[in-house]
């Protein structure tokens, strides 16, 4: 870094780097987290670190100026319960309804904005035997939810007949997914419906963690 005078300069930084910016903003799309793989949707931002000609080292490691997660991490742990476990059900798909799946990240300020319309995100399981817990997670855009909830649809197969279970998820953080937080939802699917335990929310450091029940759709 070259300093032309002795004035102190304030720095910001972001990750991952993108050379495709418009007015300092990069496009963003929701992505599933893959084990032991970096997720390009996990955007980090740091600001406020200073340096000068006399002290040229830029330090983003202290608590106040360290990198922070800008998006939300939403994790699902779905297991078979009474009437479903040991009955040869297969996991067909899961829908997350009414969410923004794309947006823009401002590399100068660290702010995030939604883009486009609300949509349904589908995760396909390709008829996986539903005998034990299935877990997966998505990096999601921080957002307010329509009517403060995200509807979940779970589709199981039994002897090639599809059974639909539904449940709403309402984040305790004012009905929205907040940036920098991890939300964990433990969902039990039973032949009478779905149970969701109380959500666990922690700074991502972490967000919600809850146990949920889903009702069978008639």
Q: What positions do the PLM features span?
A:
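Intrinsically disordered, low-complexity repeat and linker tracts
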Residues: 177, 181-218
